[in-house]
Amino acid sequence: MAPRSFWKGYLKLSLVTCPVVMAPAKSEKEKLRFHTLNRATGNRVQSRYIDSVSGKPVDSADQVKGFPRDDQSYVMLEDEELDSVALESARTIDIELFAPADSIDWIWYDAPHYLTPGDEVGEEAFAVIREAMKATKMVGISRLVLYRRERAVLLEPRGKGIILWTLRYGDEVRDPKLYFDAIKDQKPVPELLSLVNRLIEERVKPWSPEMASDPVQDRLRDIIEAKKTPPAKKTKAEEKTGKGSAESNVIDIMDALRKSLGPAAKKPKGR
């Protein structure tokens, strides 16, 4: 049984339209979430919007969006004004243009979502759009309101479905030249490069989700389980001093690489 979708609408390309459903590709189900408590009482703490000058609570009906001016005052914007600049339809993914799939750098990709046909009637139109993108090695570009924000989205054919990626806005991604241009153009020593290549080859494994597991979540669960049943007698953990022999700041890269590769990486005789 497929998981429940969180969005229903239409996929449109020119005159071709079909109903679709969408669900986030990433799950927050396993992520631990905490409440803020009052240490003295153990009760939950509630947050409220307070006027920064008067200190009085502000009801939701009196809350309004504001854009700061240079003189520290604000331009107030009502909900109707914000709605006037939004998309006409928040329920239609209208593919406006296409781009070569290999022309978009991964840094623009934000969050993935699974897009599937909404019913049996729309499966044919969905398949036509999907297979056409596969055949031409193109991805579709559109706009959509998601999470209360208008987003640029990318549609990528994947298997029998389509992955819809939200994209970062143009001004959200910094120019890498600002950071990388200052790096000196150094050519590595061939022998060093050869050793690193061997080190990489020894550590190659097929991708699996375990490679991106979150050890912090597991450690937090262990702490929570331990606190549920506290030990009869508390023991004081020994503090780690962190003392040890000071390592030299200058490391012989060649020697370090040979040690990483083991006995097989020792210098041949006669060198």
Swiss-Prot record:
Homodimer. Interacts with LigD. Disulfide bonds: none annotated. Belongs to the prokaryotic Ku family. The gene is ku. Residues 225-249 are annotated as: Disordered. GO terms for molecular function: double-stranded DNA binding. With LigD forms a non-homologous end joining (NHEJ) DNA repair enzyme, which repairs dsDNA breaks with reduced fidelity. Binds linear dsDNA with 5'- and 3'- overhangs but not closed circular dsDNA nor ssDNA. Recruits and stimulates the ligase activity of LigD. This is Non-homologous end joining protein Ku. Residues 12-194 form the Ku domain. Keywords: DNA damage, DNA recombination, DNA repair, DNA-binding. The keyword Transcription regulation does not apply. SMART domains: Ku78. The keyword Transferase does not apply. InterPro entries: Ku70/Ku80_beta-barrel_dom, Prok_Ku, SPOC-like_C_dom_sf. It holds the Pfam family Ku. GO terms for biological process: DNA recombination; double-strand break repair via nonhomologous end joining.
